[in-house]
Amino acid sequence: MSYRKLGRTSAQRKALLRDLATDLIINERIETTEARAKELRSVVEKMITLGKRGDLHARRQAAAFIRKEVANSETGQDALQKLFSDIAPRYQDRQGGYTRIMKLGPRRGDGAPMVIIELV
């Protein structure tokens, strides 16, 4: 199984992908580098598939990966609740392909290719 190392140790890489996945679930659209977005895509697709399954085991598997951050301060809903109650039902009839990557220009400081990754 291949993956991108993203210039980090395995623990740092896992933490980065957890943070990005949680942010994408909360905001439904983030701007990041192309390599990070391509790695993030597979992680988020798996989380949404767990959300579609909806049983207790799937919820616990997703909770082990998604960070406990508040998604909506008015309702007190966290990222996991948003995944299972808002995002997963939206894709109930869709078999994969829940994200879209749109290319932007290069980043000003180092010229890294930037993209916007969003939920379809």
UniProtKB/Swiss-Prot annotation:
The keyword Repeat does not apply. InterPro entries: Ribosomal_bL17, Ribosomal_bL17_CS, Ribosomal_bL17_sf. It holds the Pfam family Ribosomal_L17. The keyword Kinase does not apply. GO terms for cellular component: cytosolic large ribosomal subunit. One of its GO terms (biological process) is translation. One of its GO terms (molecular function) is structural constituent of ribosome. Keywords: Ribonucleoprotein, Ribosomal protein. Belongs to the bacterial ribosomal protein bL17 family. Part of the 50S ribosomal subunit. Contacts protein L32. This is Large ribosomal subunit protein bL17. It comes from Geobacillus sp. (strain WCH70).
